[in-house]
């Protein structure tokens, strides 16, 4: 999992995953054996971090790189001092979303508290 360094690359990878290119979003790419397999676009503001797009390249689903990419985005959000995150992307695998650490709040939105989430031991075991 690597941060996408240029908006040009981000736009190309968004196109490969059939998600809208969001010029104001930060982005990570997931790789398996050096091959691109997914993208995550996210933002941060006073309300929290928001994963806006989370998608694998067509035909290239792999749980582990997608999981690591989700956690990498959350770790970056947390390191920036934002300790609440939302998963607002449309993604069909709820088990993966839960494994990353999200749970549905009272309004049905995927949410998580990042406070101390990445401290030893990592709170990787969610309900």
Placement of each model-derived feature along the sequence:
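Conserved GNAT acetyl-CoA-binding A-motif
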Residues: 77-90
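Short amphipathic alpha-helix that is part of the acyltransferase structural core
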Residues: 1-23, 121-127
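Conserved active-site alpha-helix within GNAT-family acetyltransferase domains
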Residues: 90-108
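Conserved acyl-donor/pantetheine-binding loop and adjacent beta-alpha core of acyl/acetyltransferases
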Residues: 16-22, 41, 53, 114-115
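C-terminal "cap" of GNAT-fold acetyltransferases
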Residues: 106-127
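Conserved donor-binding loop and adjoining core beta-sheet/short helix segment
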Residues: 26-64
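Short glycine-aromatic motifs
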Residues: 4, 25, 101-103
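Conserved acetyl-CoA-binding loop-helix of GNAT-fold acetyltransferases
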Residues: 61-78
């Amino acid at each position: 999992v690597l941060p996408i360094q240029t908006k040009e690359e981000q736009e190309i990878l968004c196109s490969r995953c059939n998600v809208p290119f969001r010029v104001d979003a930060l982005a990570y790419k997931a790789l398996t054996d050096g091959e691109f397999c997914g993208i995550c676009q996210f933002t941060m503001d006073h309300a929290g971090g928001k994963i806006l797009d989370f998608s694998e390249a067509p035909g290239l689903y792999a749980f582990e790189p997608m999981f690591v990419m989700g956690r990498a985005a959350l770790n970056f959000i947390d390191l920036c001092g934002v300790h609440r995150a939302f998963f607002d992307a449309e993604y069909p695998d709820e088990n993966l979303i839960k494994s990353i650490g999200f749970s549905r709040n009272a309004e049905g939105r995927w949410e998580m508290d990042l406070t101390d989430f990445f401290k030893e031991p990592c709170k990787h075991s969610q309900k």
